[in-house]
Amino acid sequence: MAAPRTSTRKFLGRLSLPERNFVAEALRTETVGGVLLLLAAITALIWANVPALHHSYESVSHFHFGPAPLGLDLSVQHWAADGLLAVFFFVAGIELKRELVAGDLKDPKAAALPVAAALCGMAVPALVYTLTNLTGGGSLRGWAVPTATDIAFALAVLAVIGTSLPSALRAFLLTLAVVDDLFAILIIAVFFTADLNFAALAGAVIGLAVFWLLLRKGVRGWYVYVPLALVIWGLMYNSGIHATIAGVAMGLMLRCHRHQGEEHAPGEHIEHLVRPLSAGLAVPLFALFSAGVVISGGALGDVFTRPETLGVVLGLVVGKAIGIFGGTWLTARFTRASLSDDLAWPDVFAVASLAGIGFTVSLLIGELAFDGDPVLTDEVKAAVLTGSLLAALIATTLLKLRNAKYRALCEDEERDEDSDGIPDIYEQDNPAYHLRMAEIYERKAAEHRRLAEVTGGAGAENDGPA
């Protein structure tokens, strides 16, 4: 009796056309935002480190404004971290909801791999940080700093070095970042919540309930939701829970599955409107007022000698790469999934290294973890910048080694010889596509025959005696 066949499931294979189009559109905006984020970080470092400009940077960052009776007389730096990042986490909430109802996280089998990779990619950096500080006698408060991935910064690196990742690897990186954001949100909510103001928290919950009810009733109009969102955010801030949680909660409430006849779900439409605001304004401004740490030779030396900062660097550079790669490899092994024929395991390790760029959320968690110790906060920020830079350099080297292969795969994914707007690789099972291609090649063949006859005739006339 023949042994039963064991089927192997492919992962990191070709995306469906709708998923490919969604990933391409989402990452296009994130790439532009990532370049702006990179420029904002560089501007912050220059502004904070040029002696003639340093005082103005400190003055602007610590300038307070806002309604004091409402508990919102905040510095510019706090408005950026607590206010603008709420927009970023609102988009993250929509992304997570979409992944859960229509993306890779909808199917438990398909979700197992990116979720396991993301979990390992957070657990191992936290473990690396903890072991480094237990050995060196440092503070364990920053264990969560190296656990985050900054998708926008990673895409900016790809844009700068001119590397074209295949859509499957880009989708894998995007899903990793979405799951990362989810657990970062949970970490912020659970471990960095101050003394609770239950009255404000109750008000925020009631506001969220009203927000949900209006969505379910189909009420439309930004003039309804924007003021309500601001009220919810203000109440959440005063409750003691980090205000960005309000953005996530509202994002998760949006409907991201399409009803019959709908071209876009409401969540997709709102994400399309808000993502440019998040990527192009909110996150770069946060970087501008958070990345401005004073860098000196001594400070850079301390990054590699102080246990807290060394733990952050090792967590981002070593922990992220080993965690994501190890989680992916182990999950594939135990679920009997096989890697796509077009890719190799070094490609997964390169993407895992790229995920070690943990800029935005790592800076935020660093501020929360070491609140009250401005010197250590700045040192940890410098460690985040250093670790992200090292991770980017390692990923750049690894990706460049495979760039020719990636370029060929991207060209295959984008080729559209029949000019119908759909890449040819997605039409191989469509008879109409092959008929169109046959007509195209027949026209080309007829043209070549005509040219051959003309050339042959001219040659025959010139073959006669001089």
Curated annotation (Swiss-Prot):
MF annotations from Gene Ontology: sodium:proton antiporter activity
Family affiliation: Belongs to the NhaA Na(+)/H(+) (TC 2.A.33) antiporter family.
Name of the molecule in the record: Na(+)/H(+) antiporter NhaA
Keyword Transmembrane helix found: yes
Entry-linked Pfam families: Na_H_antiport_1 (PF06965)
Classification of source organism: Bacteria, Bacillati, Actinomycetota, Actinomycetes, Kitasatosporales
HAMAP family: NhaA
GO-annotated cellular components: plasma membrane
Catalyzed reactions: Na(+)(in) + 2 H(+)(out) = Na(+)(out) + 2 H(+)(in)
InterPro entries recorded: Na/H_antiporter_dom_sf (IPR023171), NhaA (IPR004670)
One biological process term in Gene Ontology: regulation of pH
Transmembrane segments: 32-52, 74-94, 111-131, 142-162, 172-192, 195-215, 221-241, 280-300, 310-330, 348-368, 379-399
Keyword entries, A-Z: Antiport, Cell membrane, Ion transport, Membrane, Sodium, Sodium transport, Transmembrane, Transmembrane helix, Transport
Main location class: membrane
Gene: nhaA
Function per UniProt: Na(+)/H(+) antiporter that extrudes sodium in exchange for external protons.
Record's bilayer topology term: Multi-pass membrane protein
Location in the cell: Cell membrane
